[in-house]
Amino acid sequence: MKTKAILIDPNLPRISTERVDGFEDIQRMIGCRCFTCVRFPDGKHVAYVDDEGLINGTELGVKFIDSIYPDALAGKILILADDGQGGDADCELTGSDIQAMVKGIVRFS
């Protein structure tokens, strides 16, 4: 079953709604082999990011407001909701919600 997600692509920059079905789709959408999760303070949403983004030459990233996450996250970010049992659920946030949480795009040197 496909799950609604929000994809942030700092290279375009663009925020879009996507559908994912499992970890292979997450890997494909954020363009990595190994990803990690950043839990949002609402306890309901999780951002999937490239676990090696800061060491593999990724040039651009996203800086959220400090209450979401204090450091810039490298590369594309995929946001899903948590079903409370270790699985994914439809993201309840909108593109506008996400835009309000993003401080800007950063370049890593």
Model-derived features: positions:
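Domain-length accessory/inserted modules outside core catalytic folds
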Residues: 1-109
